[in-house]
Amino acid sequence: LSFIFPLFWRNYIYLSLIKPYVAQKGAVRANLGLKFEILSVIKVLLAKIGVIFKKGLKMWSRDSWRKFNILQQPSYPDEALLKKAEDKLKTMPPLVFAGEARNLKQDLAKVCSGEAFLLQGGDCAESFSNFNAVNIRDMFKVMLQMAIVLTFAGRCPVVKVGRVAGQFAKPRSSDYEEQGGVKLPSYRGDIINGFEFNAEARVPDPNRMIEAYYQSASTMNLLRAFSRGGLADLHEVNRWNLGFIKKPELDAKYGELARQLSQTLAFMGACGINASNTPALSETKVYTSHEALLLPYEEALTREDSLTGDWYDCSAHMLWIGERTRGVNDAHVHFLSGVHNPLGVKIGPNATSQDVIALANVLNPQNEAGRLNVIIRMGADKIGERLPKILREVKREGLNIVYSIDPMHGNTIKAANGYKTREFDKILAEVQSFFEIHRAEGTHAGGVHLEMTGQDVTECTGGSFKLNEDDLAHRYETQCDPRLNADQSLELAFLIAEFLKKI
């Protein structure tokens, strides 16, 4: 029976049969000196056999998730309308191509080995109402500004992945929200229902998936144009950074690094290295990602690659599973186990090393470098206690994992004036702990995952401009969780640059 259930059988055979047997044969094993070799070979063989059986028995299909326990899904009142929307999405062109997802996996493999750094960031949740070219451009600019600082400090490439062109659906802690004695379904993101607090807006509407698709396609078009149309020129990006540090609050802290970068670019120009003969100076790659939460949407955009026969979720280059939906036997993990995109999974303070190992065995059975990104989100007060053991035990298993830190979700608080916010110092503290713990454990601190915007919002307190709780009301624009504004995001990049120098 274990061969019929691919989510369980490989671990069952290894833990129940192989490992105890090898343990009992200690004397023979010691004489041959093959303890670790035998175990590692067996595990690799079992992983490969698992993939063969999984494909051979066709246990996965793009709609097989529907047979599994599923969380955080809306209840659509009109099933016929839902089916119509799904069928329409299945006929639409892919938003990304399989080859691009493979390129990202190769880039993330370098992150896994410590040869590159992952910068992943963007809106908590994209919205239909705030969609415009200026907002996308400003987000793109801040990502580039952060990346050039991190590249220069870390002396390694930065893999840029936006939470963009699909980051619409949001998990909620409660199915309902109450205001002034009125109880309505919770807002789950513009792809599902409306933000306005009225009964009509809060009804899940499957046609919103179609609108989300078109907005994502427009966003992808802009990102591709920005990446190759001159906006990514390193000299321009550096000029933006020089403008940033002209503010007196910042020059003393970060001016030296920015000026060193200017001198380096000037030296390269003097040597004849410029945008006209070196495209890398004026072009860049920005990949897209989002939480694969709304599975009807993800299924509809999952396509079989004509070159390899593998399945890819073509709604984004990279997908991740949230902390609330990462059950190893649940629908979200099952669905993403069958697509070949790079994957992420959020890991909170209550997770154990066995949780991470079990997820890796299901989501990355061939142990490919660059396939799996574990996104730590524990909070500044808990990461020091919880993360070291996970790193230690996962390292012992020999698993190829990209570790990144999400310092946002574990540090969310409610201000005295009722606004949900995050303190810059707490965000920085968790990032710093993440780097220090990895250095102590001999593992790679692979990247950061941030909720941020290119706009001058006032949603997170602190930073060099010392935003306080009274400032939150000035430009509190998020429809979900608080984001770092442009200045706070770039300041955080300069501070992370100091951590990278020590690696």
Please give the residue ranges for each predicted region:
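Cationic, amphipathic, low-complexity segments that mediate targeting or membrane/lipid association
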Residues: 2, 23-36, 40-43
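Short hydrophobic targeting helices and cationic amphipathic motifs
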Residues: 5-15, 32, 39
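Polybasic, lysine-rich low-complexity intrinsically disordered segments
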Residues: 11, 25, 35-38, 48, ...
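Compositionally biased, low-complexity peptide segments typical
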Residues: 17-20
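N-terminal basic/disordered segments at the start of proteins
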Residues: 56, 60-115
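Short loop/turn segments at strand-loop or loop-helix junctions that form parts
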Residues: 119-124, 161-164, 405-408, 451-453
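Active-site-facing alpha/beta catalytic cores
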Residues: 125-126, 130-379, 422, 430, ...
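Non-transmembrane, aqueous-exposed alpha-helical and coiled segments at domain scale
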Residues: 356, 371-403, 409-457
